[in-house]
Amino acid sequence: MSVRYTLNLRVFWPLVTGLCTALVCLYHALRSSEDARAESPDGADSGFPLLKVAILLLLGYILLRCRHAIRQRLLPGSSRPRGHANFSARSLQEPGLSILLESYYEHEVRLSPHVLGHSKAHVSRIVGELVQAGRARGSPGLITGGALALAFRGDFIQVGSAYEQHKIRRPDSFDVLVPLRLPPQVALEPRSLGTEPSLTPAFRSCFVCALKAPPSPSGASTGQWHRDCKPFAEGFCVDVQGRRHLSATLVLRWFQAHLQRSLATVRYSLEGRCRVSLTPGSLEQPPTLHILPCRTDYGCCRLSMAVRLIPAVHLGDGVFLVAPPPPPSPSGALSELPGGLRAEALWGVNTARQEQKLLGWLQERAPPGACYLKCLQLLKALRDLGARGLDPMAATHWGRILSSYVLKTAVLEVLLNEGSPTPSWDEAHLSECLEKLVKFLRDCLLRRRDLFHCVLGPTGAAAEVGPLPKVLREAAPVDLLAPFDPHSRELAAARLLSTWRRLPQLLRVYGGPRYLARCPAPRSQRIQGSPEDEP
Protein backbone atom coordinates (compact mmCIF):
# COMPACT_ATOMS: atom_id res chain seq x y z
CA MET A 1 0.00 0.00 0.00
CA SER A 2 1.35 3.43 -0.88
CA VAL A 3 2.47 5.81 1.85
CA ARG A 4 0.70 9.17 1.83
CA TYR A 5 2.59 12.44 2.41
CA THR A 6 1.18 15.91 3.06
CA LEU A 7 2.83 19.13 1.84
CA ASN A 8 3.78 21.70 4.48
CA LEU A 9 3.55 25.04 2.66
CA ARG A 10 5.30 26.90 5.49
CA VAL A 11 8.45 24.92 4.73
CA PHE A 12 7.97 24.44 0.98
CA TRP A 13 7.93 28.06 -0.21
CA PRO A 14 10.95 29.29 1.83
CA LEU A 15 12.82 26.20 0.64
CA VAL A 16 11.97 26.92 -3.01
CA THR A 17 12.94 30.58 -2.60
CA GLY A 18 16.26 29.70 -1.03
CA LEU A 19 16.99 27.08 -3.68
CA CYS A 20 16.23 29.49 -6.53
CA THR A 21 18.39 32.18 -4.91
CA ALA A 22 21.26 29.72 -4.54
CA LEU A 23 20.99 28.68 -8.19
CA VAL A 24 20.95 32.31 -9.38
CA CYS A 25 23.93 33.15 -7.19
CA LEU A 26 25.84 30.13 -8.48
CA TYR A 27 25.02 31.06 -12.08
CA HIS A 28 26.20 34.65 -11.67
CA ALA A 29 29.29 33.57 -9.76
CA LEU A 30 30.32 31.25 -12.58
CA ARG A 31 29.48 33.90 -15.20
CA SER A 32 31.39 36.64 -13.40
CA SER A 33 34.45 34.42 -13.03
CA GLU A 34 34.45 33.77 -16.79
CA ASP A 35 33.90 37.44 -17.63
CA ALA A 36 36.65 38.54 -15.26
CA ARG A 37 39.23 36.85 -17.44
CA ALA A 38 38.17 38.73 -20.58
CA GLU A 39 37.10 42.14 -19.20
CA SER A 40 39.13 44.95 -17.71
CA PRO A 41 39.16 45.56 -13.95
CA ASP A 42 36.93 48.67 -14.34
CA GLY A 43 33.80 46.44 -14.63
CA ALA A 44 33.20 46.72 -10.90
CA ASP A 45 29.39 46.92 -11.14
CA SER A 46 28.99 43.34 -12.43
CA GLY A 47 27.38 42.27 -9.15
CA PHE A 48 24.49 44.72 -9.55
CA PRO A 49 22.27 42.32 -11.65
CA LEU A 50 22.77 39.65 -9.01
CA LEU A 51 21.61 42.04 -6.31
CA LYS A 52 18.54 42.99 -8.36
CA VAL A 53 17.56 39.34 -8.88
CA ALA A 54 17.94 38.58 -5.18
CA ILE A 55 15.82 41.61 -4.24
CA LEU A 56 13.12 40.61 -6.76
CA LEU A 57 12.96 37.08 -5.34
CA LEU A 58 12.72 38.44 -1.81
CA LEU A 59 9.94 40.85 -2.81
CA GLY A 60 8.06 38.02 -4.54
CA TYR A 61 8.23 35.89 -1.42
CA ILE A 62 7.02 38.79 0.75
CA LEU A 63 4.12 39.44 -1.64
CA LEU A 64 3.10 35.76 -1.51
CA ARG A 65 3.14 35.80 2.29
CA CYS A 66 1.15 39.04 2.41
CA ARG A 67 -1.41 37.66 -0.06
CA HIS A 68 -1.79 34.53 2.07
CA ALA A 69 -2.24 36.62 5.24
CA ILE A 70 -4.83 38.89 3.56
CA ARG A 71 -6.80 35.87 2.31
CA GLN A 72 -6.82 34.40 5.80
CA ARG A 73 -8.14 37.68 7.21
CA LEU A 74 -10.86 37.98 4.56
CA LEU A 75 -12.10 34.40 5.03
CA PRO A 76 -15.03 34.24 7.49
CA GLY A 77 -14.11 32.77 10.83
CA SER A 78 -10.35 32.65 10.14
CA SER A 79 -9.35 35.62 12.30
CA ARG A 80 -8.81 35.41 16.01
CA PRO A 81 -11.99 35.33 18.05
CA ARG A 82 -13.13 38.80 19.12
CA GLY A 83 -16.09 38.00 21.27
CA HIS A 84 -18.88 35.50 21.18
CA ALA A 85 -20.14 36.45 17.70
CA ASN A 86 -16.78 35.85 15.99
CA PHE A 87 -16.35 32.56 17.89
CA SER A 88 -19.75 31.36 16.69
CA ALA A 89 -18.91 32.31 13.10
CA ARG A 90 -15.65 30.39 13.35
CA SER A 91 -17.34 27.33 14.82
CA LEU A 92 -19.68 27.17 11.84
CA GLN A 93 -16.66 26.86 9.53
CA GLU A 94 -15.10 23.95 11.44
CA PRO A 95 -15.41 20.62 9.60
CA GLY A 96 -18.16 18.47 11.07
CA LEU A 97 -17.82 14.95 12.36
CA SER A 98 -18.96 13.44 9.05
CA ILE A 99 -16.25 15.30 7.12
CA LEU A 100 -13.63 14.29 9.65
CA LEU A 101 -14.74 10.65 9.50
CA GLU A 102 -14.62 10.63 5.70
CA SER A 103 -11.17 12.20 5.67
CA TYR A 104 -9.85 9.81 8.32
CA TYR A 105 -11.36 6.86 6.48
CA GLU A 106 -9.69 7.81 3.20
CA HIS A 107 -6.28 8.60 4.68
CA GLU A 108 -5.89 6.07 7.52
CA VAL A 109 -8.49 3.29 7.34
CA ARG A 110 -9.41 2.45 3.77
CA LEU A 111 -7.48 -0.23 1.92
CA SER A 112 -6.69 -0.07 -1.76
CA PRO A 113 -8.78 -2.82 -3.44
CA HIS A 114 -6.04 -3.23 -6.02
CA VAL A 115 -3.31 -3.87 -3.42
CA LEU A 116 -5.59 -6.09 -1.34
CA GLY A 117 -6.52 -8.18 -4.37
CA HIS A 118 -2.88 -8.74 -5.34
CA SER A 119 -1.96 -9.59 -1.74
CA LYS A 120 -4.75 -12.17 -1.43
CA ALA A 121 -3.79 -13.78 -4.73
CA HIS A 122 -0.13 -13.98 -3.68
CA VAL A 123 -1.08 -15.55 -0.34
CA SER A 124 -3.34 -18.07 -2.09
CA ARG A 125 -0.54 -19.24 -4.37
CA ILE A 126 2.03 -19.64 -1.59
CA VAL A 127 -0.30 -21.31 0.90
CA GLY A 128 -1.75 -23.53 -1.83
CA GLU A 129 1.68 -24.93 -2.69
CA LEU A 130 2.49 -25.45 1.00
CA VAL A 131 -0.76 -27.31 1.70
CA GLN A 132 -0.40 -29.48 -1.39
CA ALA A 133 3.11 -30.41 -0.31
CA GLY A 134 1.79 -31.28 3.15
CA ARG A 135 -0.90 -33.47 1.66
CA ALA A 136 1.63 -35.32 -0.50
CA ARG A 137 3.86 -36.07 2.49
CA GLY A 138 1.28 -38.22 4.25
CA SER A 139 -2.20 -39.66 3.88
CA PRO A 140 -4.63 -40.84 6.55
CA GLY A 141 -4.53 -44.46 7.48
CA LEU A 142 -1.67 -46.79 8.16
CA ILE A 143 1.74 -45.15 7.73
CA THR A 144 5.28 -46.34 8.24
CA GLY A 145 5.57 -47.95 11.66
CA GLY A 146 1.94 -48.99 11.78
CA ALA A 147 0.71 -45.79 13.48
CA LEU A 148 -2.38 -43.80 12.56
CA ALA A 149 -1.94 -40.08 11.96
CA LEU A 150 -3.66 -36.94 10.81
CA ALA A 151 -3.09 -35.46 7.36
CA PHE A 152 -3.79 -32.29 5.42
CA ARG A 153 -7.04 -32.45 3.50
CA GLY A 154 -5.38 -30.64 0.60
CA ASP A 155 -7.34 -27.38 0.61
CA PHE A 156 -7.47 -24.23 2.71
CA ILE A 157 -10.22 -21.77 3.67
CA GLN A 158 -9.67 -18.02 3.68
CA VAL A 159 -11.28 -16.39 6.71
CA GLY A 160 -11.10 -13.10 8.55
CA SER A 161 -11.62 -9.45 7.76
CA ALA A 162 -9.44 -9.44 4.64
CA TYR A 163 -11.91 -11.80 2.94
CA GLU A 164 -15.04 -10.11 4.35
CA GLN A 165 -14.24 -6.61 3.01
CA HIS A 166 -13.75 -4.90 6.36
CA LYS A 167 -9.99 -5.04 6.95
CA ILE A 168 -8.34 -1.73 7.83
CA ARG A 169 -5.02 0.02 7.23
CA ARG A 170 -2.57 -2.50 5.70
CA PRO A 171 -3.16 -5.76 3.80
CA ASP A 172 -0.23 -7.48 5.49
CA SER A 173 -1.92 -10.07 7.73
CA PHE A 174 -4.28 -12.88 6.81
CA ASP A 175 -6.01 -15.85 8.46
CA VAL A 176 -6.27 -19.22 6.75
CA LEU A 177 -7.93 -22.41 8.01
CA VAL A 178 -6.03 -25.59 7.12
CA PRO A 179 -8.53 -28.49 7.37
CA LEU A 180 -7.16 -31.78 8.72
CA ARG A 181 -8.34 -35.21 7.70
CA LEU A 182 -8.93 -37.92 10.29
CA PRO A 183 -8.06 -41.54 9.59
CA PRO A 184 -11.05 -43.51 8.26
CA GLN A 185 -11.01 -45.69 11.39
CA VAL A 186 -11.67 -42.66 13.63
CA ALA A 187 -14.87 -40.65 14.20
CA LEU A 188 -15.60 -37.83 16.63
CA GLU A 189 -18.40 -37.30 19.11
CA PRO A 190 -18.41 -33.53 19.88
CA ARG A 191 -20.17 -32.14 22.94
CA SER A 192 -20.85 -28.54 23.93
CA LEU A 193 -19.87 -27.35 27.42
CA GLY A 194 -22.41 -24.52 27.45
CA THR A 195 -24.80 -26.38 29.75
CA GLU A 196 -22.18 -27.19 32.42
CA PRO A 197 -23.48 -25.33 35.51
CA SER A 198 -20.16 -25.41 37.39
CA LEU A 199 -18.12 -24.09 34.47
CA THR A 200 -17.02 -20.46 34.34
CA PRO A 201 -18.48 -18.36 31.48
CA ALA A 202 -15.07 -18.17 29.82
CA PHE A 203 -15.26 -21.87 28.87
CA ARG A 204 -18.96 -22.27 28.04
CA SER A 205 -18.28 -21.61 24.38
CA CYS A 206 -15.87 -24.56 24.22
CA PHE A 207 -16.40 -28.11 22.99
CA VAL A 208 -14.85 -31.49 23.73
CA CYS A 209 -14.55 -34.29 21.19
CA ALA A 210 -14.50 -37.92 22.26
CA LEU A 211 -13.37 -40.67 19.91
CA LYS A 212 -15.92 -43.18 18.70
CA ALA A 213 -16.00 -46.00 16.20
CA PRO A 214 -17.43 -45.07 12.79
CA PRO A 215 -20.37 -47.10 11.50
CA SER A 216 -19.00 -50.34 10.10
CA PRO A 217 -21.03 -52.56 7.73
CA SER A 218 -18.86 -55.53 8.65
CA GLY A 219 -19.85 -55.26 12.31
CA ALA A 220 -16.32 -55.22 13.73
CA SER A 221 -16.08 -55.53 17.50
CA THR A 222 -15.42 -52.52 19.72
CA GLY A 223 -12.38 -54.20 21.22
CA GLN A 224 -10.79 -54.60 17.80
CA TRP A 225 -11.49 -50.93 17.05
CA HIS A 226 -9.80 -49.86 20.31
CA ARG A 227 -6.74 -51.92 19.43
CA ASP A 228 -6.58 -50.50 15.91
CA CYS A 229 -6.93 -46.88 17.10
CA LYS A 230 -4.54 -47.16 20.04
CA PRO A 231 -1.60 -45.50 18.17
CA PHE A 232 -3.81 -42.56 17.16
CA ALA A 233 -5.25 -42.21 20.67
CA GLU A 234 -1.79 -42.20 22.24
CA GLY A 235 -0.47 -39.61 19.79
CA PHE A 236 -3.38 -37.15 19.57
CA CYS A 237 -5.72 -37.74 22.53
CA VAL A 238 -5.93 -37.25 26.30
CA ASP A 239 -8.05 -39.09 28.83
CA VAL A 240 -11.12 -37.22 30.13
CA GLN A 241 -13.67 -38.92 32.37
CA GLY A 242 -12.52 -42.35 31.26
CA ARG A 243 -12.74 -41.67 27.50
CA ARG A 244 -10.16 -40.63 24.95
CA HIS A 245 -10.69 -37.07 23.70
CA LEU A 246 -8.97 -35.32 20.82
CA SER A 247 -6.43 -32.83 22.20
CA ALA A 248 -6.00 -29.40 20.61
CA THR A 249 -2.51 -29.13 22.13
CA LEU A 250 -1.28 -32.43 20.65
CA VAL A 251 -2.88 -31.69 17.28
CA LEU A 252 -1.16 -28.29 17.18
CA ARG A 253 2.19 -29.89 18.02
CA TRP A 254 1.84 -32.33 15.11
CA PHE A 255 0.58 -29.55 12.83
CA GLN A 256 3.63 -27.37 13.43
CA ALA A 257 6.06 -30.22 12.79
CA HIS A 258 4.23 -31.20 9.61
CA LEU A 259 4.26 -27.57 8.43
CA GLN A 260 8.02 -27.37 8.94
CA ARG A 261 8.58 -30.51 6.88
CA SER A 262 6.24 -29.27 4.14
CA LEU A 263 7.93 -25.87 4.08
CA ALA A 264 11.32 -27.51 3.62
CA THR A 265 9.88 -29.28 0.57
CA VAL A 266 8.65 -26.12 -1.21
CA ARG A 267 11.23 -23.60 0.01
CA TYR A 268 13.53 -24.12 -2.99
CA SER A 269 10.73 -23.71 -5.54
CA LEU A 270 9.66 -20.45 -3.86
CA GLU A 271 13.12 -18.86 -3.78
CA GLY A 272 12.60 -16.97 -7.02
CA ARG A 273 9.33 -15.40 -5.85
CA CYS A 274 9.63 -14.83 -2.10
CA ARG A 275 11.37 -15.78 1.11
CA VAL A 276 9.27 -17.75 3.58
CA SER A 277 9.73 -18.61 7.24
CA LEU A 278 7.53 -20.15 9.90
CA THR A 279 7.11 -18.90 13.46
CA PRO A 280 5.88 -21.56 15.92
CA GLY A 281 2.64 -20.79 17.69
CA SER A 282 0.55 -21.76 20.67
CA LEU A 283 -3.13 -22.25 21.46
CA GLU A 284 -3.59 -18.46 21.67
CA GLN A 285 -1.49 -17.68 18.57
CA PRO A 286 -1.35 -20.25 15.74
CA PRO A 287 1.77 -20.78 13.60
CA THR A 288 2.51 -17.79 11.39
CA LEU A 289 3.93 -18.01 7.87
CA HIS A 290 6.00 -14.93 7.02
CA ILE A 291 6.22 -14.07 3.31
CA LEU A 292 8.93 -11.57 2.35
CA PRO A 293 9.32 -10.29 -1.23
CA CYS A 294 12.50 -11.11 -3.14
CA ARG A 295 14.57 -8.45 -4.87
CA THR A 296 14.21 -10.35 -8.13
CA ASP A 297 10.40 -10.48 -7.90
CA TYR A 298 8.98 -7.59 -9.90
CA GLY A 299 5.34 -8.51 -9.36
CA CYS A 300 2.86 -5.78 -8.57
CA CYS A 301 2.10 -4.85 -4.94
CA ARG A 302 4.55 -7.17 -3.19
CA LEU A 303 4.43 -6.63 0.57
CA SER A 304 5.83 -8.37 3.62
CA MET A 305 2.91 -10.44 4.89
CA ALA A 306 2.09 -12.66 7.84
CA VAL A 307 -0.36 -15.53 7.36
CA ARG A 308 -1.78 -17.27 10.41
CA LEU A 309 -2.22 -20.97 9.60
CA ILE A 310 -5.00 -22.33 11.82
CA PRO A 311 -5.40 -26.13 12.09
CA ALA A 312 -9.08 -27.06 11.83
CA VAL A 313 -11.06 -30.28 12.22
CA HIS A 314 -14.22 -30.42 10.13
CA LEU A 315 -17.45 -31.08 12.05
CA GLY A 316 -19.78 -30.85 9.06
CA ASP A 317 -21.75 -28.21 7.12
CA GLY A 318 -18.74 -25.90 6.91
CA VAL A 319 -18.19 -25.74 10.71
CA PHE A 320 -14.70 -26.42 12.07
CA LEU A 321 -13.14 -27.11 15.44
CA VAL A 322 -10.16 -24.85 16.17
CA ALA A 323 -8.06 -23.96 19.20
CA PRO A 324 -10.15 -22.56 22.09
CA PRO A 325 -10.43 -18.78 22.52
CA PRO A 326 -7.89 -17.18 24.86
CA PRO A 327 -8.96 -16.60 28.48
CA PRO A 328 -10.23 -13.10 29.33
CA SER A 329 -7.15 -12.39 31.44
CA PRO A 330 -3.53 -13.38 30.80
CA SER A 331 -3.50 -15.44 34.00
CA GLY A 332 -6.33 -17.62 32.62
CA ALA A 333 -8.10 -19.68 35.29
CA LEU A 334 -7.52 -23.09 33.68
CA SER A 335 -7.48 -24.71 37.11
CA GLU A 336 -11.21 -24.05 37.49
CA LEU A 337 -12.25 -26.80 35.08
CA PRO A 338 -14.61 -29.12 36.96
CA GLY A 339 -15.55 -32.75 36.50
CA GLY A 340 -12.14 -33.98 35.43
CA LEU A 341 -12.00 -31.75 32.34
CA ARG A 342 -8.55 -30.93 31.03
CA ALA A 343 -7.50 -27.76 29.26
CA GLU A 344 -5.75 -29.79 26.54
CA ALA A 345 -9.08 -31.32 25.49
CA LEU A 346 -10.91 -28.01 24.94
CA TRP A 347 -11.79 -26.84 21.44
CA GLY A 348 -13.35 -23.70 20.01
CA VAL A 349 -15.70 -23.53 17.06
CA ASN A 350 -15.17 -21.58 13.84
CA THR A 351 -18.25 -20.56 11.87
CA ALA A 352 -16.52 -18.30 9.33
CA ARG A 353 -18.33 -19.93 6.41
CA GLN A 354 -21.73 -19.19 7.97
CA GLU A 355 -20.72 -15.62 8.79
CA GLN A 356 -19.58 -15.04 5.21
CA LYS A 357 -22.94 -16.33 3.99
CA LEU A 358 -24.70 -14.00 6.41
CA LEU A 359 -22.72 -11.00 5.17
CA GLY A 360 -23.54 -11.98 1.59
CA TRP A 361 -27.22 -12.30 2.49
CA LEU A 362 -27.17 -8.80 3.99
CA GLN A 363 -25.35 -7.38 0.98
CA GLU A 364 -28.01 -8.72 -1.37
CA ARG A 365 -30.73 -6.92 0.60
CA ALA A 366 -28.84 -3.73 1.35
CA PRO A 367 -29.75 -0.58 -0.60
CA PRO A 368 -27.07 0.97 -2.83
CA GLY A 369 -24.60 3.01 -0.82
CA ALA A 370 -25.16 1.18 2.49
CA CYS A 371 -22.29 1.97 4.86
CA TYR A 372 -22.47 -0.82 7.45
CA LEU A 373 -19.07 -2.25 6.43
CA LYS A 374 -17.54 1.22 6.53
CA CYS A 375 -19.04 1.67 10.00
CA LEU A 376 -17.42 -1.59 11.08
CA GLN A 377 -14.05 -0.38 9.79
CA LEU A 378 -14.43 2.96 11.57
CA LEU A 379 -15.50 1.15 14.73
CA LYS A 380 -12.21 -0.76 14.66
CA ALA A 381 -10.34 2.50 14.12
CA LEU A 382 -12.24 4.03 17.06
CA ARG A 383 -11.12 1.09 19.22
CA ASP A 384 -7.50 1.64 18.16
CA LEU A 385 -7.72 5.35 18.97
CA GLY A 386 -9.10 4.46 22.40
CA ALA A 387 -6.06 2.27 23.09
CA ARG A 388 -3.66 5.21 22.74
CA GLY A 389 -2.12 6.19 26.04
CA LEU A 390 -2.75 2.83 27.73
CA ASP A 391 0.04 0.65 29.05
CA PRO A 392 0.62 -2.57 27.07
CA MET A 393 -1.31 -4.82 29.47
CA ALA A 394 -4.31 -2.49 29.62
CA ALA A 395 -4.26 -2.05 25.83
CA THR A 396 -4.24 -5.83 25.37
CA HIS A 397 -7.20 -6.23 27.73
CA TRP A 398 -9.06 -3.40 25.95
CA GLY A 399 -8.43 -5.13 22.62
CA ARG A 400 -9.74 -8.45 23.96
CA ILE A 401 -12.97 -6.94 25.22
CA LEU A 402 -13.57 -5.01 21.98
CA SER A 403 -12.06 -7.59 19.65
CA SER A 404 -12.72 -7.44 15.93
CA TYR A 405 -15.06 -10.41 16.27
CA VAL A 406 -17.07 -8.66 19.00
CA LEU A 407 -17.36 -5.52 16.86
CA LYS A 408 -18.43 -7.53 13.81
CA THR A 409 -21.01 -9.41 15.87
CA ALA A 410 -22.39 -6.10 17.20
CA VAL A 411 -22.85 -4.77 13.65
CA LEU A 412 -24.53 -8.01 12.54
CA GLU A 413 -26.80 -7.99 15.59
CA VAL A 414 -27.96 -4.42 14.93
CA LEU A 415 -28.61 -5.20 11.27
CA LEU A 416 -30.48 -8.44 12.03
CA ASN A 417 -32.63 -6.66 14.62
CA GLU A 418 -33.71 -4.29 11.84
CA GLY A 419 -34.31 -7.20 9.45
CA SER A 420 -31.90 -5.88 6.80
CA PRO A 421 -29.98 -2.65 6.10
CA THR A 422 -32.52 0.16 5.75
CA PRO A 423 -32.06 3.48 3.89
CA SER A 424 -30.93 4.98 7.22
CA TRP A 425 -27.61 3.14 6.66
CA ASP A 426 -26.79 5.40 3.71
CA GLU A 427 -23.37 7.05 3.71
CA ALA A 428 -25.03 10.42 4.21
CA HIS A 429 -25.88 9.25 7.75
CA LEU A 430 -22.44 7.82 8.54
CA SER A 431 -21.95 9.57 11.89
CA GLU A 432 -25.49 8.69 13.04
CA CYS A 433 -24.96 5.01 12.16
CA LEU A 434 -21.66 4.97 14.01
CA GLU A 435 -23.31 6.59 17.03
CA LYS A 436 -26.00 3.88 16.95
CA LEU A 437 -23.32 1.18 17.10
CA VAL A 438 -21.47 2.92 19.93
CA LYS A 439 -24.69 3.08 21.97
CA PHE A 440 -25.39 -0.59 21.27
CA LEU A 441 -21.91 -1.60 22.42
CA ARG A 442 -22.28 0.56 25.52
CA ASP A 443 -25.52 -1.22 26.44
CA CYS A 444 -23.89 -4.61 25.90
CA LEU A 445 -20.89 -3.71 28.04
CA LEU A 446 -23.15 -2.43 30.83
CA ARG A 447 -25.23 -5.67 30.71
CA ARG A 448 -28.36 -3.85 29.59
CA ARG A 449 -28.53 -6.39 26.77
CA ASP A 450 -26.62 -9.51 25.72
CA LEU A 451 -24.29 -9.80 22.76
CA PHE A 452 -24.86 -13.34 21.54
CA HIS A 453 -22.81 -15.20 18.97
CA CYS A 454 -24.41 -14.61 15.56
CA VAL A 455 -24.66 -18.38 14.92
CA LEU A 456 -24.71 -19.78 18.47
CA GLY A 457 -27.30 -17.30 19.72
CA PRO A 458 -30.83 -17.97 21.04
CA THR A 459 -32.40 -17.13 17.68
CA GLY A 460 -29.30 -17.50 15.52
CA ALA A 461 -29.37 -16.97 11.80
CA ALA A 462 -29.92 -20.56 10.66
CA ALA A 463 -32.37 -19.55 7.94
CA GLU A 464 -29.81 -17.23 6.38
CA VAL A 465 -26.61 -19.28 6.85
CA GLY A 466 -27.94 -22.70 5.89
CA PRO A 467 -27.87 -26.00 7.80
CA LEU A 468 -25.78 -26.48 10.92
CA PRO A 469 -24.45 -29.62 12.61
CA LYS A 470 -26.68 -31.06 15.31
CA VAL A 471 -24.20 -30.28 18.07
CA LEU A 472 -24.39 -26.56 17.20
CA ARG A 473 -28.17 -26.52 16.89
CA GLU A 474 -28.44 -28.02 20.39
CA ALA A 475 -25.67 -25.92 21.96
CA ALA A 476 -26.48 -23.32 24.60
CA PRO A 477 -26.41 -19.64 23.53
CA VAL A 478 -22.98 -18.02 23.80
CA ASP A 479 -22.67 -14.46 25.15
CA LEU A 480 -19.38 -13.08 23.84
CA LEU A 481 -18.94 -10.60 26.71
CA ALA A 482 -19.89 -12.98 29.54
CA PRO A 483 -16.26 -14.06 30.26
CA PHE A 484 -15.31 -10.53 31.35
CA ASP A 485 -15.98 -9.32 34.87
CA PRO A 486 -18.44 -6.42 35.44
CA HIS A 487 -15.74 -3.97 36.52
CA SER A 488 -13.73 -4.48 33.31
CA ARG A 489 -16.87 -4.06 31.23
CA GLU A 490 -17.81 -0.82 32.98
CA LEU A 491 -14.31 0.58 32.46
CA ALA A 492 -14.43 -0.41 28.79
CA ALA A 493 -17.84 1.27 28.38
CA ALA A 494 -16.57 4.46 30.02
CA ARG A 495 -13.48 4.56 27.82
CA LEU A 496 -15.54 3.85 24.71
CA LEU A 497 -17.82 6.80 25.45
CA SER A 498 -14.86 9.03 26.31
CA THR A 499 -13.22 8.15 23.00
CA TRP A 500 -16.45 8.85 21.14
CA ARG A 501 -16.87 12.25 22.81
CA ARG A 502 -13.29 13.21 21.94
CA LEU A 503 -13.45 11.72 18.44
CA PRO A 504 -13.40 15.03 16.46
CA GLN A 505 -10.35 16.17 18.41
CA LEU A 506 -8.62 12.78 17.99
CA LEU A 507 -9.31 12.74 14.26
CA ARG A 508 -7.75 16.19 13.86
CA VAL A 509 -4.65 15.09 15.73
CA TYR A 510 -4.08 11.58 14.34
CA GLY A 511 -5.49 11.56 10.83
CA GLY A 512 -6.43 13.41 7.69
CA PRO A 513 -4.86 16.35 5.84
CA ARG A 514 -3.27 19.18 7.75
CA TYR A 515 -5.97 21.70 6.85
CA LEU A 516 -8.38 19.79 9.10
CA ALA A 517 -6.08 20.22 12.09
CA ARG A 518 -5.40 23.97 11.97
CA CYS A 519 -7.76 24.94 14.76
CA PRO A 520 -8.85 23.09 17.88
CA ALA A 521 -12.37 21.75 17.81
CA PRO A 522 -14.98 24.04 19.40
CA ARG A 523 -16.80 22.79 22.44
CA SER A 524 -20.11 22.55 20.58
CA GLN A 525 -18.61 20.11 18.08
CA ARG A 526 -16.73 18.09 20.69
CA ILE A 527 -20.04 17.30 22.35
CA GLN A 528 -21.89 16.69 19.09
CA GLY A 529 -22.70 13.06 18.40
CA SER A 530 -21.95 11.60 21.82
CA PRO A 531 -24.54 9.39 23.49
CA GLU A 532 -26.70 11.37 25.83
CA ASP A 533 -26.72 9.08 28.86
CA GLU A 534 -23.49 7.70 30.30
CA PRO A 535 -22.88 4.77 32.65
From Swiss-Prot:
Domain of life: Eukaryota
Gene3D superfamilies linked to this entry: 1.10.1410.40, 3.30.460.90
Keyword tags: Membrane, Phosphoprotein, Signal, Transmembrane, Transmembrane helix
Matches recorded under PANTHER family: CELL FATE DETERMINING PROTEIN MAB21-RELATED (PTHR10656), INOSITOL 1,4,5-TRISPHOSPHATE RECEPTOR-INTERACTING PROTEIN-LIKE 2 (PTHR10656:SF9)
Residues in compartment: Extracellular: 33-43
Cellular-component GO terms for this entry: membrane
Modified-residue entries (Phosphoserine), positions: S139
Protein name per its UniProtKB record: Inositol 1,4,5-trisphosphate receptor-interacting protein-like 2
Keyword Transmembrane applies: yes
Annotated localization: Membrane
Membrane topology: Single-pass type I membrane protein
Organism of origin: Mus musculus
Cytoplasmic side: 65-535
Pfam families found in the cross-reference section: Mab-21_C
Main location: membrane
Signal peptide (UniProt feature, chain positions): 1-32
Transmembrane segments: 44-64
